[in-house]
C-alpha cells in the first residue's frame, strides 16, 4: 500500500514538473496583456511622456504625451530647475492635440515645442492632464560644442518589450548615468497584430524614466508601417498612425518622407535620420539622397551620425538593400560620415572597413542568424545577444562601446580626429568577451532561420 502511494506520489510530482517545464518553454507573446484585458487605456493622467531634441538641442526641445479625449490643448510648464520645491512662476506652452483611435479607445496625443532656452541649462518641466499634472521632469539643454557628450544607441526593441527590453534599458542607464541623448534604430514595436497600442504602451513601460530623463531620437522601422490592401495588386506600405503623434520630432525632413526623416545638432554632433522603408518600398531613395546631401553638406560640426533602420550592408542571409547603396551610400562617403547606426537584422555586426563605421545592433528579444558573408566581412559579430551601445564624444575622440544585457563589453573602438589625416579607427580589445553564436537548432515555434523570437 505504502509502495503504491509512493509510486503515485512520484508520478504525480514528475507530471507536475513536466507540465511546468512545458508551460515555461512555450513561446512568449509579444505583450503581457492577456486577451480581453485593457491594460493601456488612456485616462486623464498624462502618460507616454517623451522629450525629443529640437533642430538645435542647445536652445529647445519638444515633448509628446497622451491623455483621454477630455484633455484638449493642455499646457506644458517649464522653469529653470532649482533645489527648492518652490518652482516659482513657470513659462507656459500650449500643446497641439491630435485624436487617435485604437483598440484601447480614443486618446488625445499632445505636442508642445519649447524654444528660446539657454544652452547647458537644467530645466524642470511638467505636462497637464485632466485637472492634474505629471511629475516635474528634468532636461538639460545641449552645451557648447567643446563639452563632452555621452549618448546611447539601441537596436530594434520590437517584441516582448516589458518582459525583455526593460532589463537592457536599465543596464544602459546604469552604465551611462550621464547620457543626455538616446537613439533608437527603428522597429520599436512589432505592430500589425491588432494590439499596436498595447505594444506602444509596453515600449514606454519598458523604457521607464529614460524618455523623460534623456532626449529621444528614433528612426522609423518597417514595423512602424503596415501593409494596406495586402495581397492585392494595390498593396503598399503606409505609415502607422502612432508614429507621427508618439514623438515630437523636428519637422525638417525631406518632403517625400516629411514625418519620418529629420536632423538635429547636439553639441559638436549632427545626427541625420533617414527612412529606409520609404526609400526601399516607396521609391524615395533618390529624394532622400538629395536631402541628405544638403543636411550633411551644411554640417558645421566635427562629428556626424546617420541613422537608418535597414542596413546598407546586411548581416542577415537573404537581405540586400540595393537602393540604399545606390542612392544614399555615395552621399555618406562623400561627406565622410563617422558612424552609420542601423537595426533590422536582429544580430550584431560591425563592417571591417575604415570610417564610415557601419554598425548593426539589436536590443530586443527577436534574434536572427548571421550570413556567411557577415562572418567574412564583419567583426565582431553576434547572435543570440541583447545589446546596448554607449557613445562618448570628447574633443577629437569618439569612444564607442557595445555591451550585452548583463553589461559585459562586446565591442569597443575609438575614432580619433587627427586633423589633416582625417579620422582614424583604433580598436580596443581589452575586456571584450568572446564572440557569441546561436546554439539552438530552431526557435520554440520551430523556425530554423531564427535563434529566438
Region locations from a protein language model:
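Bacterial N-terminal signal peptides
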Residues: 4-14
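Acidic, histidine-bearing metal-coordination/catalytic regions of metal-dependent phosphoesterases
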Residues: 19-153, 174-177, 384, 390-453
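Acidic/histidine-rich helix-loop elements
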Residues: 82-109, 152-167, 190-192, 234-237, ...
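Extended active-site neighborhood of metal-dependent phosphoesterases/phosphodiesterases
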Residues: 111-113, 122-138, 198-300, 319, ...
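Active-site metal-binding loops of divalent metal-dependent hydrolases
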Residues: 129, 154-159, 186-188, 222-223, ...
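Active-site-proximal beta-strand elements of phosphoester/diester hydrolases
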Residues: 148-158, 268-278, 305-309, 356-363, ...
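Conserved, compact domain cores that house catalytic/ligand-binding motifs in diverse enzymes
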Residues: 149-219, 224-225
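Short acidic, glycine-rich surface-loop motifs adjacent to enzyme active sites
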Residues: 185, 189, 299-316
